[in-house]
Amino acid sequence: MEVAAGAPRSRLLLFVLAATATLAPEATAFQCFCHLCTKDNFTCVTDGLCFVSVTETTDKVIHNSMCIAEIDLIPRDRPFVCAPSSKTGSVTTTYCCNQDHCNKIELPTVGPFPGKPPSGLGPVELAAVIAGPVCFVCISLMLMVYICHNRTVIHHRVPNEEDPSLDRPFISEGTTLKDLIYDMTTSGSGSGLPLLVQRTIARTIVLQESIGKGRFGEVWRGKWRGEEVAVKIFSSREERSWFREAEIYQTVMLRHENILGFIAADNKDNGTWTQLWLVSDYHEHGSLFDYLNRYTVTVEGMIKLALSTASGLAHLHMEIVGTQGKPAIAHRDLKSKNILVKKNGTCCIADLGLAVRHDSATDTIDIAPNHRVGTKRYMAPEVLDDSINMKHFESFKRADIYAMGLVFWEIARRCSIGGIHEDYQLPYYDLVPSDPSVEEMRKVVCEQKLRPNIPNRWQSCEALRVMAKIMRECWYANGAARLTALRIKKTLSQLSQQEGIKM
């Protein structure tokens, strides 16, 4: 394109004008194409610029070609008339030039025009296009909420052919859990069912209902081949607790009538989250805490609850030497909520996630670095004031004894003699808040040296008097002076014989 030779412009201005296609007119006149000039052979003469435009509206396209006089070029270096424009309902594209018939060109259109619906879509189709994505988003959100709400209810499916390691022939039809446990204890290593059998059992359990929640996750009642089981489902962040508890439960020779019967452990990754399952025997009475809240007990019932708890703890604490031996184990979180009541009125100790084992050969204790664990209300004085000897395994056993003395106090309060009994309460209910801190417990137990109150009426009943004596000997500030679990078991066994109680 040419630019007016006589225009007093710098080289920079020439470059800008050329780049923007906004041109000053030639000094002499020239001819342009004019679509309205029918008498002059569609030609006009101007001393300004040739002009061409195309205007698009919602329903038509208008082409326009003509001459623009120099006097109409305002401002002269960037005329408004040569600038493209856009307003509601139309878009105009323009082009100005300064050579003969330079505007005789076809400008491109921008179509389809903005705001105009595609010619192929009617009102119904347009509504479908708009409503479709909206419905999809709504359904997706509802599905996500449903999955999140019911994720723990997802049933384990029967193993399929894509997972041959879980094929059903490993457990024949008609086999019961009792059969499997019997075979394991009589012919196996005594350390639990084979992992393949555990996984097969876990993945064929149908969950029925949630029966409890805790800091680890949730407990469900489930069914395996018609038999009721308890399923403890750990949250994924509690994987260490799940692994530790499964490991402790599978300790050689641990199985005992007063230790919760372990059945299986399994982890299942469904692609979105990991479920960590611990399957055990189901006891419909629930925890000792729940049981004592609901019922009072007779003297016989009190002795059965206490003796079975002591028997379970004595078995945990005891080391069995031999080829199929068992290491000594300390519970470290003994309380009424971690003891279950069986159908026959006896107890079994559960929740071994914080337990520690002692290797007598090397005199080592497998314990996490943080020793301040368990429930603050049941912590022994030496745990509260940090004076416990972490390198001495007996220290952990003695702390368990202190906690068991508090559990006995909870049981004895609910023993009804002549229709008289105390309401259920947690230990130190009258001395500390419902969720006491370590400092609050330390002040009461270590500084003030207070212990739960023993009612005077207990002295009028031999069984309650013996229970009170055992409690006091479990609560000594000096752990070495406390009774052992085996000594307590023997004392309660003698009491049960005196009372004519059959366990």
Curated annotation (Swiss-Prot):
List the catalytic residues.
333 (proton acceptor)
PROSITE patterns to which the protein is assigned, alphabetical: GS, PROTEIN_KINASE_ATP, PROTEIN_KINASE_DOM, PROTEIN_KINASE_ST
Which cofactors, if any, are listed as required?
A: Mg(2+); Mn(2+)
Q: Give the top-level enzyme category.
A: transferase
Give the transmembrane region(s). 127-147
**Sites of the modification Phosphoserine?**
165, 187, 189, 191
Q: What is this protein called?
A: TGF-beta receptor type-1
At the highest ranks, the source species' classification is: Eukaryota, Metazoa, Chordata, Craniata, Vertebrata
